């Protein structure tokens, strides 16, 4: 059982790790927004919140941008995370997003993770330099 990022709120398409954003060389630095959904549905197919995730240290569950290939061109500060689209305006690039002290399983308990990418890299190509990390957690029966 594992919470995963999905590209849709119903949890039918697992996030592949690539955001479909394009930056054009004549217009770099323009923010592009998207939404991912963080949820667990494998052990809770009836969507009744049977399980909960808690941070191992007793604090909040954190989702953090990570640099998968340091020095490769993209920096974690290019990614802002928020739980709402309007929250992206005041979010700090590269900062962790707190998802609260616990999350419950099931599609109806999906957490929207709004993502804003602002990059000045203008080299054409697909970049897989950046990803997401989560702090250590435990899964418990609800």
Predicted regions and their residues:
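Short, solvent-exposed loop/turn segments enriched in Ser/Thr/Gly
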Residues: 28-39, 109-112, 122-134
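Beta-strand elements of well-folded, non-transmembrane domains
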Residues: 40-42, 117-121, 134-140
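Intrinsically disordered, low-complexity Pro/Gly/Ser/Thr-rich segments with frequent PxxP/GP/PP motifs
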Residues: 86, 91-122
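Short, polar/proline-rich extracytoplasmic segments that appear immediately after membrane translocation
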Residues: 1-13, 126, 132-142
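Low-complexity, Ser/Thr/Pro-rich intrinsically disordered linker/stalk segments at domain junctions
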Residues: 23-25, 52-63, 92-105
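Beta-sheet-dominated interaction scaffolds and their linkers
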Residues: 2-46, 55-58
